[in-house]
Amino acid sequence: MEMVCEKGSIATALNAKIYGNGSETLVLAHGYGEDQSAWQLLLPLLACYFKVVVFDMVFSPNVNPKLYDPERYQTDFKGYTDDLVCFLDHLHLHNTIYLGHSMAAMVGCLASIRRPHLFTHLILLSGSPRYIDDGRYYGGFERSEVNETYKNIEQNFMGWVQDFAPKAAGQNNTAAVAKFEKTLGRMKPYIALSAAKAVFSSDFRHKLPQVMVPCTIIQSKKDVIVPQSVAFYIKNNVGGNAIVKILNTEGHFPHLSAHNLLFRVLKETLQIKN
């Protein structure tokens, strides 16, 4: 099994693309079940103001599956963090604005702990340090639900995709549901299961106090994957400055279902004039 960072050009392996020519660099990292096309509605807007870097996470169906090592990526997010740091180094990027969606939000946090100079600002979109309830912490899922998810992915992957996509994206947005269902369904089932285990078993609550890079936490008003309370948990536990912005929309993918609303919030967050 090859390692992404030892493959030669990690930028090529992860299908990196750069848009715009702004003076500041904005890195967009997609979440589970997506690929870089998740940003297609926001890209034309953001590229007017920034040099925007997009890429595919290693679990994406667009990446050579030989690069996905379950032993490396299933146990924790270290493999993903290694990849992100290597990717930014390869492109000679530092002092970037990083927008990570869902699990990629925590990957950005972990990378910022290791190499804080790579980032000036972390934008955590629909991110969570832990998805499973734990005592007084409400993550949104009970362990039994997560175990059932693993079982469904393993036994009837496409059936699970068709059931999970509308729940995650929000029943009322057919375009967002269709987009997510398409990319999720293109994943190889064994990779989808392995990556799901990495996400749902993750617990980075103890890492949050080490995150010193300023954070903006953006969360949909209603999200069945990440409860609104998690956004405030992150704000109250990171080590650096943080603010929460709640979007008046539904679903785990506001970049698909409410991109104009999200862009307005990003303009405000990043102090874009015009």
What are these model-predicted stretches?
Residues 7-14, 53-99, 103, 264:
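Active-site loop/oxyanion-hole signature of alpha/beta-hydrolase fold enzymes
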Residues 133-141, 151-209:
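Conserved alpha/beta-hydrolase catalytic His-Asp/Glu region
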Residues 211, 217-219, 223:
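Short beta-strand/loop motif that positions the catalytic acidic residue
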Residues 250-263:
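Catalytic histidine-centered segment of alpha/beta-hydrolase-like enzymes
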